[in-house]
């Protein structure tokens, strides 16, 4: 598997940031690994443990509502959505993937809060396992970078 060229990131100083994480429990083995990698990377970027709020919801469709509730508290510089949707035999995969993704984007735009979307959508469990650690780290980096960018732009 080849990785995407993500370019060189800057604005990765998380020392002053408050970050909220919303994790879906469905496919919990994968989402726990995403969360662990995400938290580890946030700490490595300087975000203080006390400035990380981590909440869990039943599944990917519930993630946007929890993100909105956190964003409306106006305490977080950025939020992170974690989940895992694995294709099954029915149309449900497309519905959950599309609606959760649209919901995350809507919350971000409506609240002007950066949200790193790491809700994995994979064909099978093996693909999810292959992505769980790096996508968790990526989400942390995206959240920190976008929080700092929005601060610069304001």
UniProtKB/Swiss-Prot annotation:
The keyword Transferase applies. Pathway: Cofactor biosynthesis; riboflavin biosynthesis; riboflavin from 2-hydroxy-3-oxobutyl phosphate and 5-amino-6-(D-ribitylamino)uracil: step 1/2. GO terms for biological process: riboflavin biosynthetic process. The active site is at 92 (proton donor). It catalyses: (2S)-2-hydroxy-3-oxobutyl phosphate + 5-amino-6-(D-ribitylamino)uracil = 6,7-dimethyl-8-(1-D-ribityl)lumazine + phosphate + 2 H2O + H(+). Gene3D superfamilies: Lumazine/riboflavin synthase (3.40.50.960). 5-amino-6-(D-ribitylamino)uracil binds at residues 26, 60-62, 84-86, 117. InterPro entries: LS (IPR034964), LS/RS (IPR002180), LS/RS_sf (IPR036467). It is an enzyme of class 2 (transferase). It comes from the Bacteria. (2S)-2-hydroxy-3-oxobutyl phosphate binds at residues 89-90, 131. One of its GO terms (cellular component) is cytosol. Keywords: Riboflavin biosynthesis, Transferase. It holds the Pfam family DMRL_synthase. Catalyzes the formation of 6,7-dimethyl-8-ribityllumazine by condensation of 5-amino-6-(D-ribitylamino)uracil with 3,4-dihydroxy-2-butanone 4-phosphate. This is the penultimate step in the biosynthesis of riboflavin. Belongs to the DMRL synthase family. This is 6,7-dimethyl-8-ribityllumazine synthase. The lineage of its organism: Bacteria, Pseudomonadati, Pseudomonadota, Betaproteobacteria, Burkholderiales. The gene is ribH.
């Amino acid at each position: 598997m080849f990785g995407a060229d993500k370019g060189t990131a800057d604005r990765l100083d998380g020392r002053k940031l408050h970050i909220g994480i919303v994790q879906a429990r469905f496919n919990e083995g994968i989402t726990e690994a995403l969360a662990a990698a995400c938290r580890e990377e946030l700490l490595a970027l300087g975000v203080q443990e006390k400035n990380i709020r981590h909440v869990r919801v039943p599944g990917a469709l519930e993630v946007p509502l929890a993100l909105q509730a956190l964003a409306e508290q106006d305490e977080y510089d950025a939020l992170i959505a974690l989940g895992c949707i694995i294709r099954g035999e029915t149309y449900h995969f497309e519905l959950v993937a599309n609606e959760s993704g649209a919901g995350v984007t809507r919350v971000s735009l409506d609240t002007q809060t950066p949200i790193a979307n790491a809700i994995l959508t994979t064909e099978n469990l093996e693909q999810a396992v292959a992505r769980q650690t790096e996508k968790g780290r990526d989400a942390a980096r995206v959240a920190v970078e976008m929080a700092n960018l929005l601060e610069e732009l304001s």
